[in-house]
Amino acid sequence: MPKLEEIEDYDDIDNMDMDLAELDPTLNTPIAPKITPTVVRSQDIEEEERKKQYAGSNKEMISFINPQTGKVEESAPITKQELDEVKKFQVLYPCYFDKNRSHKEGRRVPIEMAVENPLAKTISDAVREYGLLSIFEGDKCHPQDFGNPGRIRVLLKEEGKLVPSASKFSGGKRQLMKLVAEYLQKHPTTVESLRELPYGPDFDNIEFKKIPKVKGFKMNDIVPLHSPYLWGHPMTKSIYEAPKIEAPEKQFKAPKNKFKVVRR
């Protein structure tokens, strides 16, 4: 039986492209259709014009962590071929470092190195601190952890060789995950950590708070604002609602047979 630390080939399911809208087409997420804002700002108009400019072309936009500012920024439009190259990057999901999950449920580091409520943004901060090229995908989620959206793609190798920025990572992804786990332990997740995530104007009035955990349901109590756990969506709303108590049906009593006695 191999030890947990010796397992490396686990990218088959973890590398799936799954976003929140794919779980439920009616769910409004940062990549699903947005609710039209009542106040139209100039920057919103500029953003819309920029999207129209590349509509119908063979180019897409990706988000990345600016190593100088630490903020999530959008790249210049890239071609489908370039996007295919990006998909060869190593993938890190928050559930890899979740101490409340078993290996079968998505954890990939030893339990003593795992933490409570890991967030993709904190993982990206760790990767940036080690000087690695990374891409932040805030709308992607692990199939077993759809309530905690976000993942990081990290460039370690090209054509089987370590890239210059990853020259110290001869241990590959296992070594990287160990260092990321150490960073997460030094930077525990709090409600204030949610303010560091990039959000659009649709989230301006949403309160940062912990959410109640549901018994028997694997979930975190600190999740990004665009998590379906915070939206009261039908997909997850039922886990917070108390089951309706059905009134017992009234038993039907058969009528008594009445006899009339006639005396002669």
Curated annotation (Swiss-Prot):
It comes from Candida glabrata (strain ATCC 2001 / BCRC 20586 / JCM 3761 / NBRC 0622 / NRRL Y-65 / CBS 138). Coiled coil: none annotated. It comes from the Eukaryota. Keywords: Cytoplasm, Ribonucleoprotein, RNA-binding, Signal recognition particle. It holds the Pfam family SRP19. The keyword Aminoacyl-tRNA synthetase does not apply. Disulfide bonds: none annotated. This is Signal recognition particle SEC65 subunit. Its main location: cytoplasm. GO terms for molecular function: 7S RNA binding. Belongs to the SRP19 family. The gene is SEC65. GO terms for biological process: SRP-dependent cotranslational protein targeting to membrane, signal sequence recognition.
